[in-house]
Amino acid sequence: MRSGAERRGSSAAAPPSSPPPGRARPAGSDVSPALPPPAASQPRARDAGDARAQPRPLFQWSKWKKRMSMSSISSGSARRPVFDDKEDVNFDHFQILRAIGKGSFGKVCIVQKRDTEKMYAMKYMNKQQCIERDEVRNVFRELEILQEIEHVFLVNLWYSFQDEEDMFMVVDLLLGGDLRYHLQQNVQFSEDTVRLYICEMALALDYLRSQHIIHRDVKPDNILLDEQGHAHLTDFNIATIIKDGERATALAGTKPYMAPEIFHSFVNGGTGYSFEVDWWSVGVMAYELLRGWRPYDIHSSNAVESLVQLFSTVSVQYVPTWSKEMVALLRKLLTVNPEHRFSSLQDMQTAPSLAHVLWDDLSEKKVEPGFVPNKGRLHCDPTFELEEMILESRPLHKKKKRLAKNKSRDSSRDSSQSENDYLQDCLDAIQQDFVIFNREKLKRSQELMSEPPPGPETSDMTDSTADSEAEPTALPMCGSICPSSGSS
């Protein structure tokens, strides 16, 4: 059940806060300001610029979805396309529906796979921009990680492919919006709801640890809700893989959510940091959801050395009205010393404040969330669609025509080297090294491999059936058995 505190105050969307925080990466520390604690009379902290922001128009998701379904019905007399199973997935396999978001160097839109009519989110990243911003390595690392993992509380990768301009990732479509969006809409999250998010993230982080992965960017912006209100972790762009006994050392993450040991390692050297940093970030996120601002007043302009000093001198202030159980849980997550911090699923399961949690039910999404996003709305900024249609110099919906023109232009050019040899070399390297991935095909392959071999009676039956059928049906389906080269 939703508590009254978790209902929006009005039908009009609240003014948006400033853009989501930037991230510190191994090559730098470009991060956004934290939310400073407001005066006691203020109901909720706002990012800088709120006073100038205009209310967002509501996007009527239910009406749009109905219109799309009617469009499908009107063209439903035509058969679904059937793609050759031996063919690699590509841009033509998807119908672009609308833009829903953008990141530092990529954009996201809703797509529908033409043959199955399943809906996904598709993130696409311009190759040239990635090269110019030195982001290619991060994209490849994210793909490497996402192709190897799958979990109920992660945003899972289904397909990856490329064309001359862009790299594409097709992932789970979650229509409930991210937690940053709901903070900006002034949603008042109850303790029960925040506790559920903490537990769902605990299951996700426990799985990532089993795969030797540190996410390094857990924050409200990267936690998406599904239509039922369950939390899913996304964006592995600065995640890292560490083997047994190894430690990470790079300054990477979003400053207000980065654990103290990351700054300490950067300033003083030492042994580095490990999986505990993600659990600190969960604590910061939970505190922010409950109070409206973060436990430490950290800005992008803060020197790393000053942050090391801050964590040793400033203590977190907890609201007296919060329950003792919630305060105890937050204290364990926000412990400065990583050795004493909650940093494993076992720690959580043995915590007195979580003794009532049914972890098996939780992992199967049987626990009903306290906050359920409004199903009649698309929980994103509708101006993304306008930007894509009007301001974008290379809009996605005109890609086929643009690529056809480029091919025609390229064929008529002189074969001499272009002036930008370096850029072309980088583009060629991406084209060669990019790994195409198809989880749908991989799952079919695994299902076929797991089927038990037929017994003698079954074998006889199969043979007689095959003899009575047309010859093509007796042939082995090589395309459905053999996954693409990127599926392993």
Curated annotation (Swiss-Prot):
Region Disordered: start and end of each range?
Answer: 1-56, 397-420, 443-488
Classification via InterPro entries: Kinase-like_dom_sf, Prot_kinase_dom, Protein_kinase_ATP_BS, Ser/Thr_kinase_AS
Q: Please list the GO terms describing molecular function.
A: ATP binding; metal ion binding; protein serine kinase activity; protein serine/threonine kinase activity
List residues binding ATP.
Answer: 100-108, 123
Composition-biased stretches (Low complexity): 24-33
**Keyword entries, A-Z:** ATP-binding, Kinase, Magnesium, Metal-binding, Nucleotide-binding, Phosphoprotein, Serine/threonine-protein kinase, Transferase
Which residues carry the post-translational modification Phosphoserine, per the record? 10, 17-18
Question: What are the catalytic residues?
Answer: 217 (proton acceptor)
Q: Which reaction does it catalyse?
A: L-seryl-[protein] + ATP = O-phospho-L-seryl-[protein] + ADP + H(+); L-threonyl-[protein] + ATP = O-phospho-L-threonyl-[protein] + ADP + H(+)
What region holds the Protein kinase domain? 94-354
Xref: Gene3D superfamilies:
Phosphorylase Kinase, domain 1, Transferase(Phosphotransferase) domain 1
* Pfam families named in the record: Pkinase (PF00069)
Residue stretches of biased makeup (Basic residues): 397-406
Q: Name what cofactor the protein needs.
A: Mg(2+)
Which enzyme class, named as a word? transferase
Give the E.C. number(s). 2.7.11.1
Which family is annotated? Belongs to the protein kinase superfamily. Ser/Thr protein kinase family.
Name of this chain's protein: Serine/threonine-protein kinase 32C
Q: What is the lineage of its organism?
A: Eukaryota, Metazoa, Chordata, Craniata, Vertebrata
